[in-house]
Curated annotation (Swiss-Prot):
GO molecular function annotation: rRNA binding; structural constituent of ribosome
Organism for this UniProt entry: Burkholderia ambifaria (strain MC40-6)
Pfam families: Ribosomal_L9_C, Ribosomal_L9_N
Name of the protein in question: Large ribosomal subunit protein bL9
UniProt cross-references to InterPro entries, sorted A to Z: Ribosomal_bL9, Ribosomal_bL9/RNase_H1_N, Ribosomal_bL9_bac/chp, Ribosomal_bL9_C, Ribosomal_bL9_C_sf, Ribosomal_bL9_N, Ribosomal_bL9_N_sf
Keywords linked to the UniProt accession: Ribonucleoprotein, Ribosomal protein, RNA-binding, rRNA-binding
GO biological process, any: translation
Amino acid sequence: MQIILLEKVANLGNLGDIVKVKDGYARNFLIPNRKARRATKEAIAEFEVRRAELEKVAAEKLAASQAVGEKLNGQSFEITQKSGVDGRLFGSVTNGDIAELLKKAGYEVEKLQVRMPEGPLKMIGEHTVQVALHTDVVVDVTINVIGDHA
């Protein structure tokens, strides 16, 4: 399906690009999340009229994300979990737990924005986690997992 992107989408393209994607990806993700529209002649003409407005909104989102990213980059947060004497956690610290921790600290972060390439944290100690505030703004945050011996 041919679509026109209404914002920058990772691994796909930038605002205004006309790309071909699988029908399911367009119908189930891009179009419902208002990231794209079908690339009909009418939609392309309407997009060209609204292009400046959409670019302004995208620039504002990027600037806001960069401002939050400057505050958040390099920050360290502590989370306490029950653990055994060998340093392994009972359970794990997931991206949802980290997003909740960041929300309590005053940052608007969804769990999908927290990237944990090595999977959930299962050991006590310091771990570096990435937070993707925008497709162009990715910051590193240190999570210090403290063991609460049961």
